[in-house]
């Protein structure tokens, strides 16, 4: 399992939200590229970037900040938020991103995921955000009647690199991840699952490591590493030690 530091972008700045609410944001850094370098220095092996403005607008909104981040680090990067078509996927991959995340578009147009996986093999991730087990879209502003597990099963055989599962009710709340829901999703599909939302301590990471055998291969952490509740370097060392046996 790897620990994946997150950078959420709003109006060009690095912020964190509570439960995905845009009016409950805290600005942590005015220079996202420098923040990305810091996470790389602390041992981050993959950087998770979210274009929050893009997620709500349905189109890219922080391109200059994203480009600056990609140029600033050598580690792989993945981006989600406002990516709704093949043209945007290609543009971001051409920018230097390692892979892109389809969220709202994946729920509304699964065929886009299939097409993208064929055009860009190994570079497409699906983000499934859920509240009480139901998929939320449009920057979490809209909860659907589709169950997360049912949506994830749609993508079996498409060639999706990973599914990022976020429990919205836990995100930014520092209350611990939803281990049971994450494990259940991982057991239901053959696609690797990355856990997100609520990670607040090294103990939370250890608890997720305990379900790695179910197919949970990574954990995204945001607020905890910005507030100091988790030191990224310590979290990385913990998971590396486990990987090395």
From Swiss-Prot:
Main subcellular localization, coarse class?
cytoplasm
Q: Where in the cell is it found?
A: Cytoplasm
* Keyword Isomerase tagged: yes
Q: Which GO terms describe its cellular component?
A: cytoplasm
Mind telling me which InterPro entries this protein's record contains? Aldolase_TIM, His_biosynth, HisA_bact_arch, Isoase_HisA-like, Isoase_HisA-like_bact, RibuloseP-bd_barrel
Quote the CDD domains the UniProt record gives: HisA
**Hey, which pathway is this one from?**
Amino-acid biosynthesis; L-histidine biosynthesis; L-histidine from 5-phospho-alpha-D-ribose 1-diphosphate: step 4/9
Protein EC = 5.3.1.16
Q: Which GO terms describe its molecular function?
A: 1-(5-phosphoribosyl)-5-[(5-phosphoribosylamino)methylideneamino]imidazole-4-carboxamide isomerase activity
| EC supergroup of this enzyme | isomerase
GO terms in the biological process aspect are: L-histidine biosynthetic process; L-tryptophan biosynthetic process
Reactions catalysed according to its record: 1-(5-phospho-beta-D-ribosyl)-5-[(5-phospho-beta-D-ribosylamino)methylideneamino]imidazole-4-carboxamide = 5-[(5-phospho-1-deoxy-D-ribulos-1-ylimino)methylamino]-1-(5-phospho-beta-D-ribosyl)imidazole-4-carboxamide
Name the active site residues. 8 (proton acceptor), 129 (proton donor)
Q: Residues of the signal sequence?
A: none
Q: Does the keyword Amino-acid biosynthesis apply?
A: yes
UniProt keywords (A-Z) are: Amino-acid biosynthesis, Cytoplasm, Histidine biosynthesis, Isomerase
Similarity comment: family membership: Belongs to the HisA/HisF family.
Q: Which PANTHER family match?
A: 1-(5-PHOSPHORIBOSYL)-5-[(5-PHOSPHORIBOSYLAMINO)METHYLIDENEAMINO] IMIDAZOLE-4-CARBOXAMIDE ISOMERASE (PTHR43090:SF2)
NCBIfam families in the cross-refs: 1-(5-phosphoribosyl)-5-[(5-phosphoribosylamino)methylideneamino]imidazole-4-carboxamide isomerase, PRK13585.1
Its recorded name reads 1-(5-phosphoribosyl)-5-[(5-phosphoribosylamino)methylideneamino] imidazole-4-carboxamide isomerase
């Amino acid at each position: 399992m790897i620990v994946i530091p997150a950078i959420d972008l709003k109006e060009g700045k690095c912020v964190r939200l509570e439960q995905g609410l845009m009016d409950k944001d805290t600005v942590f850094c005015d220079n996202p590229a420098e923040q990305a370098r810091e996470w790389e220095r602390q041992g981050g092996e993959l950087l998770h970037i979210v274009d929050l403005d893009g997620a709500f607008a349905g189109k890219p909104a922080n391109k200059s900040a994203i480009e600056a981040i990609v140029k600033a680090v050598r580690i792989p990067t993945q981006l989600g938020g406002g990516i709704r078509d093949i043209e945007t996927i290609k543009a971001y991959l051409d920018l230097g991103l390692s892979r892109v995340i389809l969220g709202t578009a994946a729920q509304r147009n699964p065929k886009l995921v299939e097409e993208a996986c064929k055009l860009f093999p190994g570079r497409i991730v699906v983000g499934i955000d859920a509240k009480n087990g139901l998929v939320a879209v449009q920057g979490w502003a809209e909860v659907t009647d589709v169950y997360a597990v049912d949506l994830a099963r749609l993508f079996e055989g498409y060639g999706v690199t990973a599914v990022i599962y976020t429990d919205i009710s836990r995100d930014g709340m520092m209350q611990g991840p939803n281990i049971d829901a994450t494990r259940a999703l991982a057991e239901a599909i053959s696609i690797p699952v990355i856990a997100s939302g609520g990670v607040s301590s090294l103990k939370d990471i250890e608890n997720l490591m305990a379900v790695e055998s179910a197919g949970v291969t990574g954990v995204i952490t945001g607020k905890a590493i910005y507030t100091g509740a988790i030191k990224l370097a310590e979290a990385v060392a913990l998971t590396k030690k486990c990987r090395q046996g």
